[in-house]
Design a protein with these regions (language model features):
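N-terminal glycine-rich anion-binding loops that anchor highly charged ligand groups
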Residues: 1-3, 10-56, 62-73, 290
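N-terminal small/glycine-rich loop or linker at the start of catalytic domains
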Residues: 2-14, 79-83, 109
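Glycine-rich anion-binding loops and their surrounding alpha/beta cores
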Residues: 3-4, 11, 18, 66-69, ...
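Short glycine-rich or small-residue beta-strand-to-loop segments that form or flank ligand, phosphate
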Residues: 13, 44-48, 79-84, 298-301
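A glycine-rich phosphate/pyrophosphate-binding beta-strand-loop-alpha-helix module
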Residues: 44, 91-147
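Active-site cofactor/substrate anionic-group-binding motifs, chiefly glycine-
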Residues: 51-112
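Acidic, glycine-rich active-site loops and adjacent beta-strand->loop/helix elements
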Residues: 82-87, 112-118, 157, 223-225
Length: 357
C-alpha cells in the first residue's frame, strides 16, 4: 500500500488538487507497483468525477515518461493519436490518417493500445490489417527508418503499466490514462496531432501539452469525437512554445462534404480494417473525406504543407497515386518477415530442448 497515494486520495476527497510534483510522485508509485488495486481504482475514479487538473496530468505524464522504453526516431517524426473513450463508435480515423501521412513521406511513430472501451483500438485494427504491432525499440526504429511508419504498442514500451492495466480494464470507462497515452510517446515526438473527445477537456489538454513543452502540437476536437469531423464542429488548438491559439475547422469551407458522425461509424477490428483498405484504395465518400481532413492536420503539424487546404490536396494525391496501398504492402511484408523469423527461432529453440544430452 502506498502512503503517497493514500494521502492523495485524502486530498481529492476533501476537494483539493495535487500539485505537479505531488502528482509525479503519486504516478511513480502507481507505475512502480506501490499502489494497491483499490487505491488505484479510487484515484482514477476520483479524478474522473472531479476532472483532472493541468498540474495533475502534467505530473502524471512526467512520471510515465521517466519510465518509458525509448525509441530512436527520424528527425521530424510525428504522432497522430486520439485519447479514445469518446463513445462515438467511429472507425479508426486517426490510424487511417497516420498511414496516409506516412505514405506522403512524413515518418509516423504511432503510439497506441488495444481497445479498452470501444470495439477496436489502434492495435486491434492494425493487427487486422496485417501490420506488425509487436515491435521492440530496435525493430520499431528500423521500421521507422525503412518504411516511415511504426506502431508502438503501449504495453511493450510502458512495462510499468502492467501494474495499472488490470484495474483500468475492470473499470471500463475513460480515465486519466486515456489522456496520458498521447502525452507519453516512446519516440518522444515533439510534433503531434492529439485528439480529445471531451469538449471540456480539450482546452485543458492543450494547456497540459504547453506545460510539458512541445515544438508544435495540434489538439483537435469535434462534437463528441476525438478527431476533426465533417459536421463543422471541428476545433483545433495550436500549441507551441509561445502559447496556445484556437481555430475553428469547417470541413465545408475546405471543400469537403458535410456529414454526420453517424455516417463514419465503425465496428469490429476486421470491419474497420476493411474500411481503411477502402480509403487507401481510393474509394470516395465520407470515410475518405474525414481521413483527408485529419491527415491534412498531420501534414500541417509536420511542416510538410502550409495550410489545411494544401494538406487535403497532398493527402488526396498520396492516396490516388497508390502510395497508401504501397505502404500497406510494405508493412504487411515486414510483418510476414518478422513472423517467419520468430517461427524459425521457436523451431530452433525446440530442437535444442529436444536434443539428447
Amino acid at each position: 500500500m502506498s502512503e503517497h497515494v493514500r494521502d492523495a486520495l485524502a486530498t481529492i476527497v476533501d476537494g483539493g488538487t495535487l500539485g505537479l510534483d505531488e502528482a509525479r510522485v503519486v504516478m511513480g508509485e502507481v507505475m512502480d507497483g506501490g499502489a494497491t488495486p483499490a487505491q488505484l481504482a479510487a484515484l482514477l475514479m476520483g479524478l474522473r468525477m472531479r476532472g483532472e487538473t493541468v498540474d495533475e496530468l502534467a505530473g502524471f505524464a512526467l512520471a510515465m515518461r521517466e519510465r518509458v522504453v525509448r525509441v530512436d526516431a527520424p528527425a521530424g517524426a510525428i504522432d497522430l493519436v486520439g485519447t479514445g473513450g469518446d463513445g462515438s463508435g467511429t472507425f479508426n480515423i486517426s490510424t487511417a490518417s497516420a498511414l496516409v501521412v506516412a505514405a506522403a513521406g512524413v515518418p509516423v511513430a504511432k503510439h497506441g493500445n488495444r481497445a479498452i472501451t470501444s470495439k477496436s483500438g489502434s492495435a486491434d485494427v492494425l493487427d487486422a490489417l496485417g501490420i506488425r504491432i509487436d515491435h521492440d525499440a530496435v525493430s520499431a526504429s528500423a521500421s521507422l527508418r525503412d518504411t516511415g511508419f511504426a506502431f508502438l504498442f503501449a504495453p511493450n514500451f510502458h512495462p510499468a503499466m502492467r501494474h495499472a492495466g488490470p484495474t483500468r480494464r475492470e473499470i471500463g470507462v475513460r480515465t486519466a490514462f486515456n489522456l496520458l497515452g498521447p502525452l507519453t510517446n516512446p519516440a518522444g515526438t515533439t510534433r503531434q496531432v492529439l485528439g480529445v473527445g471531451d469538449a471540456r477537456a480539450a482546452g485543458r489538454f492543450a494547456e497540459v501539452v504547453h506545460r510539458l513543452g512541445t515544438e508544435r502540437t495540434f489538439v483537435i476536437h469535434g462534437d463528441g469525437v476525438d478527431e476533426l469531423p465533417l459536421d463543422d464542429s471541428g476545433m483545433l488548438y495550436h500549441v507551441g512554445p509561445d502559447g496556445i491559439e484556437q481555430q475553428r475547422v469547417l470541413a465545408s469551407a475546405l471543400g469537403l462534404t458535410m456529414t454526420t458522425t453517424a455516417r463514419l461509424a465503425g465496428g469490429t477490428a476486421a470491419e474497420n480494417a476493411r474500411a481503411i483498405e477502402g480509403v487507401l484504395h481510393g474509394e470516395p465518400g465520407a470515410r475518405r473525406d474525414v481521413v483527408l481532413l485529419n491527415a491534412a492536420a498531420g501534414l500541417l503539424v509536420a511542416g510538410a504543407v502550409d495550410d489545411l487546404e494544401g494538406g487535403i490536396e497532398r493527402a488526396a494525391l498520396t492516396i490516388d497515386a497508390g502510395l497508401g496501398n504501397a505502404l500497406l504492402a510494405r508493412l504487411r511484408a515486414e510483418r510476414r518477415s518478422a513472423d517467419v523469423e520468430a517461427a524459425d527461432v521457436e523451431t530452433a529453440a525446440s530442437a535444442v530442448e529436444g536434443a539428447p544430452a
